[in-house]
A protein has these predicted regions:
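GST-like domain detector, emphasizing the conserved glutathione-binding G-site
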Residues: 1-137
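Surface-exposed helix-capping loop/turn segments at secondary-structure junctions
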Residues: 84, 145-153
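Short, local alpha-helical segments
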Residues: 121-124, 144-148
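Solvent-exposed, charged/polar functional surfaces in cytosolic regulatory/catalytic domains
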Residues: 135-138, 142-146
Length: 153
């Protein structure tokens, strides 16, 4: 059974959804960020970036346990482990990785910043709010354009 170090963040949910879709058994180990659990040495040994999610799979690729942090790395690992949700053909694989990197490098960070500056910044910074709101709109347009002709990203 895979140990999933989790807190209900967008990246955490990505992994729980994937584990469910793959039908892999897992145990949720809460990492309460409000209490600082992400800074405890035992968690840092698994996720040196002190972010969720992270997993420990006791049945790693060589039969030995493996710990993995960063949601994209976890998703690629799980797809390769099961042979599901990742095309075998090189062109299909490139497309999946391309959109995964788009989500990780563009969607997540930009929407996270938009949310932060709109809802949590200690002071209203119009430049930041406007910049990230415009970028969020641009990102949604990229997604809409892709989905106009495709069932999935």
């Amino acid at each position: 059974m895979i140990d999933l170090y989790f807190w209900p963040t967008p990246n955490g949910w990505k992994i729980t959804i994937m584990l469910e879709e793959l039908g892999l058994p897992y145990k949720v180990i809460p990492v309460e960020i409000g209490k600082g659990d992400q800074f405890k040495p035992e968690f840092l040994a698994i996720s040196p970036n002190n972010k969720m999610p992270a997993i420990v799979d006791p049945d790693g690729p060589d039969g030995e346990p493996i710990s993995i942090f960063e949601s994209g790395a976890i998703m690629i690992y799980l797809a390769e482990k099961t042979g599901k949700l990742m095309p075998a053909d090189p062109r299909g694989r490139i497309r999946v990785l391309e959109w995964l990197m788009f989500q990780m490098g563009t969607v997540g960070p930009m929407l996270g910043q938009a949310h932060h500056f709109r809802n949590y910044a200690p002071e209203q910074i119009d430049y930041a709010v406007n910049r990230y709101t415009r970028e969020a709109s641009r990102i949604y347009q990229v997604i809409d354009t892709r989905l106009a002709d495709n069932t999935y990203l």
